[in-house]
């Protein structure tokens, strides 16, 4: 009976070591870069008074420059008429459209686009933002700067 208990105990220890070792070797994919932002009216230039808010989460694959994103929003003054990634610009500046979102723009929304090397570098440098436009705010109702997540 003692040998059976010893064998069970040894088996449990070995299984625990394997599980811990397996977890220790799991690493995040080094070629994927995660971004996120919160969309607010106060981030627009000039600022917009609105109760609307939103979130954008994106992942850039540095191997093929494929950008995938998901966006949610609520509280807009009306239906979203357009949404885009803009850049390059510093925070507080406006920039040209880099990647337009396909219509219809609804929440939740998901999209993807292949970036140029220059676009990917600008996004990695924090020089891109997302904004959502409405009829009441044709210049954009809410905006957020894409930030690399650690």
Task: State each model region's role.
Residues 2-5, 19-83, 87-150:
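Metal-centered catalytic cores of metalloenzymes
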Residues 6-10:
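N-terminal export and membrane-targeting signals
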Residues 11-21:
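Bacterial N-terminal signal peptides
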């Amino acid at each position: 009976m003692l040998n059976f208990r010893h064998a069970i105990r040894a088996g449990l220890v070995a299984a625990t070591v394997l599980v811990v070792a397996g977890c220790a070797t799991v690493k995040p994919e080094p070629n994927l870069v995660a971004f996120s932002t919160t969309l607010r009216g106060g981030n627009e230039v000039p600022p917009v008074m609105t109760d609307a808010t939103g979130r954008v989460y994106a992942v850039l694959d540095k191997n093929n420059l494929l950008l995938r994103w998901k966006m949610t929003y609520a509280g807009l003054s009306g239906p979203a008429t357009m949404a885009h990634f803009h850049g390059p610009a510093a925070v507080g500046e406006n920039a040209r459209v880099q990647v337009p979102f396909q219509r219809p723009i609804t929440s939740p929304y998901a999209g993807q686009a292949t970036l140029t090397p220059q676009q990917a570098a600008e996004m990695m440098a924090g020089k891109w933002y997302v904004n959502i436009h409405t009829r009441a705010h044709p210049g954009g109702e809410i905006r957020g700067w894409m930030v690399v997540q650690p």
